[in-house]
Amino acid sequence: MGKNKYTLAVLGAGTLWGFMGFFRRTLDTMGLSASNCIAVRGLFAALLFGVAMLITDRKAFRVKLRDAWCFFGSGIVSLLLFSLCYFKAMDYMSLSNAAILLYTAPCFVILFSALLFKEKITARKLAAMVIAFAGCCLVSGIGTGSKISTTGILFGLGSGICYALFSIFSRFAINRGYSTFTINFYTCLLAGFGAMAVGGAEFIPVITSTAPNLLFAAATGLVTCFLPYLLYTYGLTGLENGKASIMASIEPVVATLCGIFIYNEALTVMSAVGILLVLSAIVLLNLKSKTA
């Protein structure tokens, strides 16, 4: 399959992330805060990664002290801060505007990767980035929300930058020989405990009060954190950061489709065009070319 397997892995990750809205809404009904949701995702995913490592390779738990910053970066600076900034941005602007600023992430990934890893900024990559961003804007409903502020913009851009940094810190860890399991175990563990430090642990009695609640919390960690981050970091082992980040833009497309099929939300012309643009960007990136 060549690089196709890495492409499919990243697309799979973006698809699973697209279901986050469904899980977040359900956790909201249980009374969990934004930081509680992050803790649930991170800790259950860390548990799954830990079990997998115990079964397959216990040596994967070993991390050199001089490399600890990679995992602090991916867990605290990226996963935790990206989520907190994104949720905070929603307090100062519409959901659509917050989402649009989050989707600036591929721009930062391409820039940082060019500076740090000497990845080439090709015309095709730039074109795909612009097309994907335009598609994300349309899918998110640009212009439908008027509430906006400087504080909201700063939090929104912060979410985009922190989101982008996961690819960067993960690349540093991959280049140092760490497996996708090691990277994600410590990323999720640190993000989970970091979220508990911010929002407390009052969610624990809630999710353990009934078997359905506990199963749903575990499913949240599995579907929105364990599987997508495993797939995405695996994709990074065979793809450039910039390409992977752009292809992960399939996430808002899936989120929109979830809204349509699960919550009976209407598919607008704007959203339909946005979906086509995102898919076009993904196709453009995967056309064979010596310069792509």
Stretches with model-predicted labels:
Residues 1-36, 40, 145-172, 193-194:
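Glycine-/small-residue-enriched transmembrane alpha-helix faces in small-molecule transporters
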Residues 21, 50-97, 138, 221-239:
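Specific transmembrane alpha-helical segments of multi-pass solute transporters/efflux pumps
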Residues 27, 37, 41, 89, ...:
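Hydrophobic/aromatic residues within transmembrane alpha-helices
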Residues 29-81, 108-109, 162-169, 184-203, ...:
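Transmembrane alpha-helices of multi-pass small-molecule transport proteins
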Residues 40, 83, 98-104, 170-192, ...:
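Helix-helix packing/entry segments at the starts of transmembrane helices
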Residues 45-64, 133-147, 190-213, 257-261, ...:
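Membrane-interface helix-cap regions at the ends of transmembrane helices
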Residues 48, 53, 86, 105-130, ...:
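C-terminal transmembrane-helix exit sites in multi-pass transporters
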Residues 49, 112, 121-141, 160, ...:
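Hydrophobic transmembrane alpha-helices of multi-pass small-molecule transport proteins
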